[in-house]
From Swiss-Prot:
A zinc finger (C2H2-type) spans 1-5, 11-33, 39-56. This is Protein hunchback. The lineage of its organism: Eukaryota, Metazoa, Spiralia, Lophotrochozoa, Mollusca. Keywords: Developmental protein, DNA-binding, Gap protein, Metal-binding, Nucleus, Repeat, Zinc, Zinc-finger. It comes from Bithynia tentaculata (Spire snail). The gene is hb. The keyword Nucleus applies. Gap class segmentation protein that controls development of head structures.
Length: 56
């Protein structure tokens, strides 16, 4: 938590200039570099990389 106050972002993406405070944020960001859409709507053909995109 303290890193948030000092601006330290030790976790860096190897594919772009993104950096963040914790590893879980980096893991989520790395999905943006893939073509995998693992979350699918049960009612239509919509698919997304992020599960929160399916929630109302």
């Amino acid at each position: 938590h303290v890193r948030n106050h000092f601006g330290s972002k030790p976790h860096k993406c190897g594919k772009c200039n993104y950096s963040c405070v914790n590893k879980s944020m980096l893991n989520s960001h790395m999905k943006s570099h893939t073509n995998v859409y693992q979350y699918r709507c049960a009612d239509c053909t919509y698919a997304t990389k992020y599960c929160h995109s399916l929630k109302l």
